Amino acid sequence: MLRRDKKRESRIARERVFYLIKRAEEWKNIDYELARRYVELARKIAMRYRVRIPRELKATYCKKCLYPYKAGKFRVRVRKSRVIITCLNCGFERRIPIRPKRVNRKV
Amino acid sequence: MRGRLQGVELIARDWIGLMVEVVESPNHSEVGIKGEVVDETQNTLKIMTEKGLKVVAKRGRTFRVWYKGKIMRIKGDLINFRPEDRIKRGLMMLKRAKGVWI
């Protein structure tokens, strides 16, 4: 029986996801709509082959409308011990909590 | 013909960003379209040429591709999938073909 080579698939998928998000980052000032399409494709591939997108790459685009954040189109504020990133295209707020460093109580 | 097939990666890889030229096409005015692929759908490639954006169907065409310093000819029928499907279905399609090692 023919089997899928899942290791190979996920390796190729990972390459493609990283490549597309990087490309979206480069193209966002040239063609914003196309940059969004790259993010969309990257996410589709990542979901199908269960590739995890690292946190620092996830923070480069809006989770809701998938437009990459670019200068003038997003706002970053620190409120109530959270970093709040607002997308000015769709108004979606992403809240990233800032955890204080763990203190070892026993000492 | 047995042996490892060249350019298997290309079927599963991203075509966005590659230089491409249309070599054969049932539509004569499409032959010679050359440029960078900027977007891809299930049935078409969107190619950015010097004269603007061109949309070329994949089925029935042959493409010349510049990839890692090599020039390859690829039939459009082989990549006639959705871009995210191409990894799985493209590789399986090659596996099913007789006498092909990947």
UniProtKB/Swiss-Prot annotation, chain A:
Catalytic activity: Endonucleolytic cleavage of RNA, removing 5'-extranucleotides from tRNA precursor
Keyword Metal-binding carried by entry: yes
Broadest EC class assigned to this enzyme: hydrolase
Record-level GO cellular component terms: cytoplasm; ribonuclease P complex
Subcellular location, record wording: Cytoplasm
Classification via InterPro entries: RNP4, Rpr2/Snm1/Rpp21
Binding locations of Zn(2+): 62, 65, 87, 90
Keywords from the named record: Cytoplasm, Endonuclease, Hydrolase, Metal-binding, Nuclease, tRNA processing, Zinc
Domain of life assignment: Archaea
Entry note: cofactor: Binds 1 zinc ion per subunit.
Cofactor: Zn(2+)
Disulfide partners: none
Gene Ontology MF term list: ribonuclease P activity; zinc ion binding
EC number(s) given by UniProt: 3.1.26.5
Biological processes annotated in GO: tRNA 5'-leader removal
Known function: Part of ribonuclease P, a protein complex that generates mature tRNA molecules by cleaving their 5'-ends.
Quaternary structure annotation from Swiss-Prot or TrEMBL: Consists of a catalytic RNA component and at least 4-5 protein subunits.
HAMAP family documented for this protein: RNase_P_4
Family: Belongs to the eukaryotic/archaeal RNase P protein component 4 family.
Name of this chain's protein: Ribonuclease P protein component 4
Name of encoding gene: rnp4
From Swiss-Prot, chain B:
One annotated GO biological process: tRNA 5'-leader removal
UniProt keyword Protease present: no
UniProt-annotated location(s): Cytoplasm
Pfam families (alphabetical): RNase_P-MRP_p29
Catalytic activity: Endonucleolytic cleavage of RNA, removing 5'-extranucleotides from tRNA precursor
GO molecular function, one term: ribonuclease P activity
EC number: 3.1.26.5
Keywords attached to this entry: Cytoplasm, Endonuclease, Hydrolase, Nuclease, tRNA processing
Subunit-structure text: Consists of a catalytic RNA component and at least 4-5 protein subunits.
Task performed by this protein: Part of ribonuclease P, a protein complex that generates mature tRNA molecules by cleaving their 5'-ends.
Protein name: Ribonuclease P protein component 1
Lineage: Archaea, Methanobacteriati, Methanobacteriota, Archaeoglobi, Archaeoglobales
